[in-house]
Amino acid sequence: MARLTALIEEPTSLPYFRAKVAQEKLIEASGIPYTIIRSTQFLEFLDSIAASGTDGSMVRISPGLFQPIAADDVAAILADVALAAPRNGVVEIAGPERAPFNEIVARYLKALGDPREVVSDPEARYWGGRVDEHSLVPLAEARLGRISFDEWFRRSQAAA
């Protein structure tokens, strides 16, 4: 069994991620050979992330580190892992670029021509909890995608 889930820093204060930890524990206890693929957030969700942080004409986003991955990279890695022998463990995956969360969202909005101002707010919430510097990035070795933000944005605009 190969299971795609969110990248989780344990212990976590984020309710969404606590639910993901519970799912992983069920898989581990099942006795079925498995590989859990923990992915950072997808680049394709940047629009909804910006929307969730919008407060009037500003977008409040944590300055914690962020390393989003393109869905095409996730699909390629997932297929590779699913076809390999189960590891009975975890594979972490992330995009090739790491930067503060607020800077990536600002870069995205600027590329869109969106006039909203992105404000670095250490108290900004994400999935119901506070984000610290390393909550959303792999802390150990991770398998990195190949598609950069610029390449992903170019492709996404061409497909629109």
Give names to the regions the model predicted.
Residues 8-117, 121-127, 133-134:
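Oxidoreductase cofactor-interface core, primarily capturing Rossmann-like NAD(P)-dependent enzymes
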